[in-house]
Amino acid sequence: MLSDWTSIELATRLRTMNRILDCIVPDPPTEAVDDAIEIVLKAVGRQEMTQAVTILEEVVNTNPFWLRGYLLLATIYQYVQYADQAIVTIEKGLAICASGLRLFSAPKWIEAVERINGPVVHNRIRNHAERLRRYERMFRHRLAMLQVRCGNLDEAIEQWSAIEEVHGA
């Protein structure tokens, strides 16, 4: 009975997370990703966590820049008491954010963008960089909370410091 309640709670949390992320950091709509999320939610509802994890891992491995997938996957790992795997997943998402942000701040990239004479292009690039920064903050926050739960207080403080540093910049 308790496991039924937990799977319903997890499915509700994943669905709610997905809706909130649609508002905060909307992804371009793709039928394949929407279908994958629906299949994952149904699998969680049936308590088939292995299937849900496998599907999310496949989608993230196919498209490593689908940052939402890392958050959803880490949430499932956290609910099935695999905190270490949740941490690894969040760290992977954080690494993807960092590589994207490095790309946007590279001198050659900035020079190339400055030569483009179009406000629409500049706007899209700024929006994408802001989207990466939002995900980075979410990943760092989530990682800090997971580190606290695991008793890794030094690592948690490191993440909180990085969050403060980003907000101060």
Please tell me what each predicted stretch does:
Residues 18-35, 125-136:
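TPR-adjacent "capping" and linker segments in tetratricopeptide-repeat scaffold/adaptor proteins
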